[in-house]
Amino acid sequence: MKEEVKGIPVRVALRCRPLVPKEISEGCQMCLSFVPGEPQVVVGTDKSFTYDFVFDPSTEQEEVFNTAVAPLIKGVFKGYNATVLAYGQTGSGKTYSMGGAYTAEQENEPTVGVIPRVIQLLFKEIDKKSDFEFTLKVSYLEIYNEEILDLLCPSREKAQINIREDPKEGIKIVGLTEKTVLVALDTVSCLEQGNNSRTVASTAMNSQSSRSHAIFTISLEQRKKSDKNSSFRSKLHLVDLAGSERQKKTKAEGDRLKEGININRGLLCLGNVISALGDDKKGGFVPYRDSKLTRLLQDSLGGNSHTLMIACVSPADSNLEETLNTLRYADRARKIKNKPIVNIDPQTAELNHLKQQVQQLQVLLLQAHGGTLPGSITVEPSENLQSLMEKNQSLVEENEKLSRGLSEAAGQTAQMLERIILTEQANEKMNAKLEELRQHAACKLDLQKLVETLEDQELKENVEIICNLQQLITQLSDETVACMAAAIDTAVEQEAQVETSPETSRSSDAFTTQHALRQAQMSKELVELNKALALKEALARKMTQNDSQLQPIQYQYQDNIKELELEVINLQKEKEELVLELQTAKKDANQAKLSERRRKRLQELEGQIADLKKKLNEQSKLLKLKESTERTVSKLNQEIRMMKNQRVQLMRQMKEDAEKFRQWKQKKDKEVIQLKERDRKRQYELLKLERNFQKQSNVLRRKTEEAAAANKRLKDALQKQREVADKRKETQSRGMEGTAARVKNWLGNEIEVMVSTEEAKRHLNDLLEDRKILAQDVAQLKEKKESGENPPPKLRRRTFSLTEVRGQVSESEDSITKQIESLETEMEFRSAQIADLQQKLLDAESEDRPKQRWENIATILEAKCALKYLIGELVSSKIQVSKLESSLKQSKTSCADMQKMLFEERNHFAEIETELQAELVRMEQQHQEKVLYLLSQLQQSQMAEKQLEESVSEKEQQLLSTLKCQDEELEKMREVCEQNQQLLRENEIIKQKLTLLQVASRQKHLPKDTLLSPDSSFEYVPPKPKPSRVKEKFLEQSMDIEDLKYCSEHSVNEHEDGDGDDDEGDDEEWKPTKLVKVSRKNIQGCSCKGWCGNKQCGCRKQKSDCGVDCCCDPTKCRNRQQGKDSLGTVERTQDSEGSFKLEDPTEVTPGLSFFNPVCATPNSKILKEMCDVEQVLSKKTPPAPSPFDLPELKHVATEYQENKAPGKKKKRALASNTSFFSGCSPIEEEAH
């Protein structure tokens, strides 16, 4: 009852969940550590919190329930209300701990939460209490967006639920569905129905996040079957709160954001209630009505309930701030004091109250009339009452005397009993020592005999030392007995002193009487205990004596038993022999007399065996009796020890009671003395006041005379007061400057600390995001390593050997391992930085800092100075913000202008790029025509092979003319290369301008790899725009077979031997030159693209045949001499084989790369055929004399090759870049 009046604190259990896979993938670390064997948790390195229960991540659900929740259920059956409350941030495991997502399929799983286990335990206890009748009702509600919804009602729209407050029953919910349940299965089905109706949604932090507060209530009413009027009512509230959340982490939008705002609002009101109840200094208003959640939990927090708060936290360091807030709220909740009472039925309580009132009135009536008077007495009531009062007074006085005597007798009895006990203990010790000394004396005699026999000097010395020690022991035992006797005498003297103290007043008589009765009762118990102890000890003594006397008999019986057993064995053997002899004698008729004797002997032996067995059984019974006696003796000794301990405790209790009574008596005596002294002082003060009154009456006359003088002095004092006030104002104005400086410095420091704290939080969030990205990269690399995939290298299309592929795979695995190690090292470094920052924030943000912050402002003057300084800082910050905003607007406008310019330049770049692409297409077409021309010349050389056989001189002239044509073509190709180089320089200039524009706009509108990569397929930068474009023609050059073969083989080798790393070098090495543009008038021959059949052909217009300098196709041209003869044949072959078709450069064929250009470079097969033809021609050339000297011809050819060698590099580059979009490398294909 005393605890209920004082209040019972709210019990807090801390539960920490393990790290979830998402936190592990983000690289989060544990920020909580647990003290083994203690309910204590440490945040960081030195900030610790202590609670009633602490459960680490490895704790199972069953242990949490049995340790923290199960004790509350016992109080529910005693009539007390109980509440289990789960509190914490979102995703911390509240619904898991409470079992808010329970279904019937999880019945026997170890992950079942608190609510299903509570239901099972309730019905188990109900089954045990067979003498009570129980009625159970359940209700289930949720608070969603500050609206109460009934989860057990099938149609939520119809239910209108309101909260009402009853002065007798407390908070009531009107309109809430309550279902009566009889078995546990019905209750579980109600729970499952409510869980299915509960509002749940997914957020970025939790896939199954509770969006409402849920309260499952079980109402229990119990009545005794024997007494229907006595009944108890209790309620058990099981609360699963929604978790506090941050929009930054949950990324909630729309309805989820609105739900999160309402959840945080309700939890804020709950936190305010916890803070108000947990602060002992405030003791003021508690804001229960701020939200519906706190209104419903009014009895659970600071009211009529046993409450347990399960604080659920996350151990991840990314949630440190939310975890710390939860720990602080839980620590405050431990300071809340509840006042639970037994909830009795109002009718039963009223009935019991009336019964007590009737009893009190009956007692008062008896006291007034002196008991029930018979009707025959005719004496007046007043005289009878007077005599009864006198008699009562005399009886009271006699009772007081008897109580004093009883207390004195009890004290003396206690003292005597204490002496007896001490003497008994001393006697027992002495007997034990006597026994030891006897044993020592026997040992001493043995040792002396041994010494005499062995004559060893060392043993004699040891024996002397033992004798000295025995004497010392006896002396010490005598001293201890003397000390005990002295202690007993001092105790007796103290009691005598106490008894000789002055008598107390009548007000202490009741306490004295109670003390005397207690002492008498304990003395009586002690006497009875001593009697029982004496009987037990006597019985034990007798039984031990009997045992000692029975011991030799026991030995004798054991010997007799052995002898009897031997005799029985011998007689048994003899009996068996006789039986055998009788069986043999039956066969022989002559031995009848002998068998008769043997039969009699057999009967005698059987009688002896029976007698011996009887004796054996009797002696074994005696031995068993001896063993039972020993057991009884040991049991008696144990009971004697227990009774002695009980006697000691009773004596100690009597002594403590006597000591308390003595202290109380001394205190009362001291109070009486103080009261007497106070009365004397009051009398003296009364006399003193009388004298003072006389003096004051004499002084009064004098004061009236001095009134005028006092009036004058008052005016002077007022004048002085005004002067002092003026001086005070001046000092205050002077002191205000010092106060302002002090307040300014203090506020500056506080603002700086708060700003640095916020910056540290921002850096902490950045570090957490960095670690999250690093963890994702590590996870991706590990997945690639486990699956055997390689990172996609940028390689050209080529054929790899098996060893190269294996080498690349091993190199890629090593690189992945190194990347993983470097990333893990970086993650460890980030984790160390995060832990350091979090520890600094914990040190900076102490719980008392907000309270201590305003303690420095104690006066209105300091508050004014602080307000003035803050207003000044606010104005200056506003001005600075406006300046920054104006500069930001200017930078935005300049950025917009830059973007506009960049957009225009990009459009211009696109136009120039399209023009260059068209120009390149034209150049490619011309190049293809030249290749076809060379192939036609090769065909012509094959046709002329027969003519070479006829005349060597004609063949030599034709070869020289071919060489000349090839030289001219080579010169033209060089001019084309120079033009290409010029275009590339212009490209580089425009590219630099574009880069400058991007830097000026501070935005990378084009990706860096698209603009600057040497491997890009779109590396064309347009030249400066010109006002007018003039169509130009490029010079044509011829190229001999050897040059084409060399260039083609070199390009093929480069494609086969080069990889992705050598692309940049190749692209940088080749720098095409700008083609030289010549006017139309310098071009010789026609520029037809068709058959040269009409007068649009320049050569036909001038009435001349097309020649080598013409751009027309020799196989199609009708204006050539050789083409006129075989026109029909050429036309047929042109349409089928030799015609040139310009392919669409944007057409993509499956399996080929994007922008696969027309293959203009001859492949190795064609070049090989060319070489074979040339070798045949050279072999078939006869060594006949001719107008041209062949050695000279060879000399000219070698000189030509030597002159041509410096230009091979450019030719090779030109041959490798003759594809579509010449001047840029082809698109690289990823290795799959």
UniProtKB/Swiss-Prot annotation:
Gene Ontology molecular function terms on file: ATP binding; DNA binding; iron-sulfur cluster binding; metal ion binding; microtubule binding; microtubule motor activity
Covalent cross-link (Glycyl lysine isopeptide (Lys-Gly) (interchain with G-Cter in SUMO2)), residues: 1194
Effect of residue 771 to K: In TMDI; uncertain significance
Residue ranges of domain Kinesin motor in the record: 9-336
InterPro entries according to UniProt: Kinesin-like_fam, Kinesin_motor_CS, Kinesin_motor_dom, Kinesin_motor_dom_sf, P-loop_NTPase
Composition bias, Polar residues: 497-515
Residue numbers of Phosphothreonine PTMs: 799, 995, 1181
Positions of region (Required for the interaction with PRC1): 663-1232
Cofactor note: Binds 1 [4Fe-4S] cluster. In the presence of oxygen, the [4Fe-4S] cluster may be converted to [2Fe-2S].
GO cellular component term, pick one: nuclear matrix
Biased composition (Basic and acidic residues): 1132-1142
Biological process, per Gene Ontology: anterograde axonal transport; mitotic cytokinesis; mitotic spindle midzone assembly; mitotic spindle organization; organelle organization; spindle elongation
Main location: nucleus
Segments carrying motif Nuclear localization signal: 793-798
Pfam families xref list: Kinesin
Tissue localization of expression: Highly expressed in hematopoietic tissues, fetal liver, spleen, thymus and adult thymus and bone marrow. Lower levels are found in heart, testis, kidney, colon and lung.
Annotated region described as Disordered, given as residue ranges: 496-515, 1122-1142
Cofactor: [2Fe-2S] cluster; [4Fe-4S] cluster
Effect of residue 317 to H: In TMDI; uncertain significance
Disease: Intellectual developmental disorder, X-linked 100: A disorder characterized by significantly below average general intellectual functioning associated with impairments in adaptive behavior and manifested during the developmental period. Intellectual deficiency is the only primary symptom of non-syndromic X-linked forms, while syndromic forms present with associated physical, neurological and/or psychiatric manifestations. XLID100 clinical features include intellectual disability, epilepsy, microcephaly and cortical malformations. Taurodontism, microdontia, and dens invaginatus: An X-linked recessive disorder characterized by the triad of taurodontism, microdontia, and dens invaginatus. Taurodontism is a rare developmental dental condition that largely affects the molar teeth and may be associated with hypodontia. In taurodontism, the crown of the molar tooth and pulp chamber are disproportionately longer than the roots. Microdontia, a mild form of hypodontia, is defined as smaller than normal teeth with shortened crowns (vertically or mesio-distally) and loss of contact areas between the teeth.
PANTHER family named among the record's database cross-references: CHROMOSOME-ASSOCIATED KINESIN KIF4A-RELATED (PTHR47969:SF15)
Function: Iron-sulfur (Fe-S) cluster binding motor protein that has a role in chromosome segregation during mitosis. Translocates PRC1 to the plus ends of interdigitating spindle microtubules during the metaphase to anaphase transition, an essential step for the formation of an organized central spindle midzone and midbody and for successful cytokinesis. May play a role in mitotic chromosomal positioning and bipolar spindle stabilization.
Subunit structure of this chain's protein: Interacts with the cytosolic iron-sulfur protein assembly (CIA) complex components CIAO2B and MMS19; the interactions facilitate the transfer of Fe-S clusters to KIF4A to ensure proper localization of KIF4A to mitotic machinery components. Interacts (via C-terminus) with unphosphorylated PRC1 (via N-terminus); the interaction is required for the progression of mitosis.
Protein name from the UniProt record: Chromosome-associated kinesin KIF4A
Naturally occurring in which organism (per UniProt): Homo sapiens
Name of the gene encoding the protein in the UniProt record: KIF4A
